[in-house]
Amino acid sequence: TAGMLTGCGSDDKAKDKDAYRQYGINCIENGSYDDAVDAFQKALDQSVGSVGAEELDICYYKAKAQYLSGDVDGAIDTYTAIIDYNKDSDAYYLRGCIYFAKNDSDKGLKDFKTALSENDDNYELYLGVYETLSKYGMNDQGKEYLDNALKLKAKTADDYMQRGRIYTMLGDYDSAIKSLQKAIDEKLVKANYYMGEVYQKKGDNDSSQKYFKKYLDSGEVDSYELMNMGQAQMDNGNYDTAITYFQNALELESVPNKQQITKAMIIAYEYSGDFATAKSKMEEYMKDYPDDEDAAREYQFLETR
C-alpha cells in the first residue's frame, strides 16, 4: 500500500494521510505493530506542520501501536506531545496507565488526578482509573474514585448507564439494575449489554442472555463486547453459543482484538469436542501469529487428538 502512495499537491497529501492512517489501523488489527507505527508516522508527515483533530487522532493511534510493539517510552513521548499541545485529559489518563505498566505508580496517580481535574464529570474516566488501580492491586484506592463518581448528578441516559456500571463494580447489583433500567427506558441500546453483565454476575444466565441478545440484535455491538459475551458463555459451558459470538465478532468491519478472539474461538471448539475444526483454525492462527509460543504448544497438543 505504502509504495503506491505519492505526496504531490495538498489534495494528494490529504489522501495519503487517510490511506496511511487506515493502513496503520489494519496493521494494529493484524498484530503488525511496528508497521503500524511507521504508517501513522507517515500519515503525520503528510500534515506539513498543521495540527488538527485528525492529526491528534493519528497520534493516539501511534501511541497505542508504540505501546503494543513494546516501545513504552515512545508511547509516553507521544502522549506527552499531545499533552504539551492541548492538555487533553485522555492523554493524561493513557500516559498514566503506561506509567503503571512501568511500575511507576506515583507518576501514574499524578496523571490520573490531572486527567480528572481537566474532565471531572466524565464517568468513563473514573471507571478507567478504577480498573487500572484494581489491576495493579490498589482496589481500595480505586473504589474511592468510584465513590467520587457517584457524587456526580446523572443528567443523561449515558450517565445512568455509567452509574449502572459503577454500581456493578461495587457489587451493588440492585442499584445497578435501577440505573441501567433508566438508561434502557430512555432508549440507550448499549445499556442492555451492561444489564446482561449484571445478571451474569448474579448467576441469572437466562436474563443475562435476554439482554445480551437485545443488544446483539441492535447491530451496535463491537468486537470487545462480543468477545465478553462469548467468554460468559464459555464460563457456563455453552461452547456452541460462545463460538457463534466469536464468529459474529470476527465478521465485523473493525476487529482490533482479532488475535484474542480467534484464540478464544479455538479453545471453544476444543472444549466442545470438535478437535478437527480446532486444529484447522489453529493452523490458520499459527500462520497469522507465528510468534505465539503458547499457541505453538497448544497446536502440538491438538495434533495428538
Model-predicted regions and their roles:
Residues 46, 50, 84-85, 118, ...:
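Structural marker of alpha-solenoid helical repeat scaffolds
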